[in-house]
């Protein structure tokens, strides 16, 4: 059930629209301004398309296209005109919106950032992509963690970006922090189609969490994006799926965060987000509450290392034309100082 794409909205439903936006080419500030206008127009289309819609979601790269250009002239700032236009579009159309920007970083490479703006034009969620699609993408690794917010109609919402969703730990973190709906925006192209589909479903099922996922669409003359808007219910079943590859189509469905809450509390079989920390509770009271996973201990200790670590051949972006980096990240950078 998806309420006929949100046409029939139930008392506790949240209607989501996923914009399979036509892939643009953005090189200049003028291109950026033109694409900003296109996105603003599409926010209006979303409202005209479906009066019941609560949240409209735009894909990763919707503003900048699939260029890896880090030219500061076309990078965005939170107080810049592009974000201001998105805020006003949400106000004008009385709708929440999820947007993608490549964000200027004075201390390194730009961030690949995502914003959720409410219907009053306020930024409610600000996220920087944790896992850039290496070795292809040059973006700075995110440093803000994964925020979870209270979205439209009280739904708990998280946002991850593209390659993030290939790491099961990302979806688990969203759910662990309370997310009932996880948005995944992407710029993926056709070769990733199968991986895209099964990870969207797995991320939902393993965490009893709705996932709402969308890519860019169409061709820019070099790359062919696939659209593939998918709204997946918390049991892994697909509620809506854009399979035609039609650019600027908006894929819609009603989702039910209240049923997510009910499942997380009431399910026995396959309540995996709970059972991870309560292994074998039939045999031992409360289950085994330990951490048997070596990789988790090693990550916390800063000693994560694969058995084949020294054999990995691609460890920077030089194969894709980027210079080898010299800076280090986070605690390592502070220690070096």
UniProtKB/Swiss-Prot annotation:
Q: Which biological processes are named by the entry's GO terms?
A: putrescine biosynthetic process from arginine
Q: Does the keyword Hydrolase apply?
A: yes
Give the encoding gene's name. amiF
Q: Which Gene3D superfamilies match?
A: Carbon-nitrogen hydrolase (3.60.110.10)
Record's family?
Belongs to the carbon-nitrogen hydrolase superfamily. Aliphatic amidase family.
Q: Which EC number(s) are documented for this chain? A: 3.5.1.49
- What domain of life is recorded for the organism? Bacteria
| Free-text function comment from the UniProt entry | Is an aliphatic amidase with a restricted substrate specificity, as it only hydrolyzes formamide.
Q: Where is the active site?
A: 60, 129, 162
Name the Pfam families for this protein.
CN_hydrolase
GO terms assigned for molecular function: formamidase activity; N-carbamoylputrescine amidase activity
Return the protein name: Formamidase
Q: Which residues form the CN hydrolase domain?
A: 14-257
Alphabetic keyword roster: Hydrolase
């Amino acid at each position: 059930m998806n309420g006929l794409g949100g046409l029939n909205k139930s008392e506790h439903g949240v209607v989501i629209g996923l914009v399979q936006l036509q892939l643009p080419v953005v090189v200049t500030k003028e291109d950026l301004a033109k694409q900003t206008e296109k996105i603003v127009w599409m926010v209006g289309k979303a409202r005209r398309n479906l009066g019941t819609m609560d949240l409209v979601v735009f894909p990763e790269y919707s503003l900048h296209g699939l260029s890896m250009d880090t030219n500061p002239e076309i990078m965005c700032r939170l107080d810049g005109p592009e974000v201001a236009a998105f805020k006003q579009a949400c106000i004008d159309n009385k709708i929440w919106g999820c947007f993608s920007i490549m964000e200027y970083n004075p201390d390194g490479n730009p961030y690949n950032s995502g914003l959720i703006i409410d219907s009053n034009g306020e930024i409610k969620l600000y996220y920087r992509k944790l896992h850039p699609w290496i070795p292809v993408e040059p973006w700075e690794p995110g440093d803000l963690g994964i925020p979870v917010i209270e979205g439209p109609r009280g739904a708990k919402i998280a946002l991850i970006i593209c390659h993030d969703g290939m790491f099961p730990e990302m979806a688990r973190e969203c759910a662990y922090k309370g997310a009932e709906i996880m948005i995944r925006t992407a710029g993926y192209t056709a070769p990733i189609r199968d991986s895209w589909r099964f990870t969207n479903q797995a991320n939902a099922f393993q965490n009893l969490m709705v996932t709402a996922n969308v890519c860019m669409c169409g061709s820019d003359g070099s790359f062919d994006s696939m659209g593939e808007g998918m709204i997946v219910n918390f049991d892994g079943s697909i509620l809506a799926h854009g399979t035609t590859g039609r650019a600027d189509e908006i894929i819609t469905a009603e989702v039910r965060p209240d049923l997510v809450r009910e499942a997380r509390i009431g399910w026995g079989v396959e309540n995996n987000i709970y059972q991870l920390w309560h292994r074998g509770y039939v045999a031992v009271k409360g289950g085994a509450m330990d951490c048997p996973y070596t990789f988790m201990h090693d990550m916390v200790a800063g000693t994560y290392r694969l058995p084949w670590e020294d054999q990995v051949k691609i460890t920077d972006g030089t194969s894709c034309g980027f210079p080898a980096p010299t800076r280090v990240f986070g605690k390592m950078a502070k220690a070096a100082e």
